[in-house]
Design a protein with these regions (language model features):
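Glycoside hydrolase catalytic-domain context in secreted enzymes
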Residues: 1-192
Length: 192
């Protein structure tokens, strides 16, 4: 086990930024001098979507189990089902050398027009938090990390990098943050 604080203090600003930006779409940058390897991440809220480094076309992904969309599995309100789904995804990630699965999508559904509603668990913060925690616990039980996304109030695809989600602090605290808080407290995802 590494002393993380010591390791970070030994990194240059450029090395820290490199870990945030990545070597390519699916790998973090490695830091050879400190023994930090690259990490392969892969999309996959509903199944592993691993692609070659040079491939961006989702139709060129490896063959993998495809689960129903989160909005469908959430209808079951079955924590054990989500745990089992997570375990299966964790096993597939290990078989394909994927270290971190980019999911689950925990953000709350705000509009029926949101382009990511299919992958968001629910418009209900309690349901989204409980089921995402089970999913995360399943994946991470196989020593594969998860990355809960798309952090708080990212509720549209059109101009999503430049739009503003204006709301009161009360709305953030009562509707958007609770699902993330539950997931973090009950499952401790490796990344947010």
């Amino acid at each position: 086990m590494h002393d993380i604080d010591k390791l970070i203090s030994e990194m240059t600003l450029e090395e820290k930024a490199g870990l945030c930006s990545g070597a390519d779409f699916w790998h973090t940058k490695k830091v050879d001098r400190l023994g930090i390897p690259d990490v392969m991440v892969s999309d996959g809220p509903h199944g592993l979507r691993k692609q070659d480094i040079d491939t961006v076309d989702p139709n060129e992904s490896i063959k993998a189990v495809c689960f129903p969309a989160a909005c469908a599995t959430a209808c079951s309100f079955d924590r054990e089902l989500m745990l089992s789904m997570g375990e299966t995804l964790g096993e597939e990630c290990r078989a394909e050398d994927v270290s971190v699965l980019l999911g689950p999508a925990v953000n709350i559904k705000r509009s029926p027009l949101c382009g990511r509603n299919f992958e968001y668990i629910s418009e209900d913060p309690y349901l989204a938090g409980e089921l995402s925690a089970a999913y995360i616990n399943g994946v991470q039980s196989k020593n594969v990390g998860t990355s809960i996304k798309h952090f708080a109030a990212n509720s549209q695809e059109t101009r999503r990098m430049t739009c503003s989600s204006d709301m009161s602090e009360r709305t953030l605290r009562e509707i958007y943050f609770p699902a993330f808080e539950t997931a973090v407290k009950k499952a401790q995802p490796w990344t947010v």
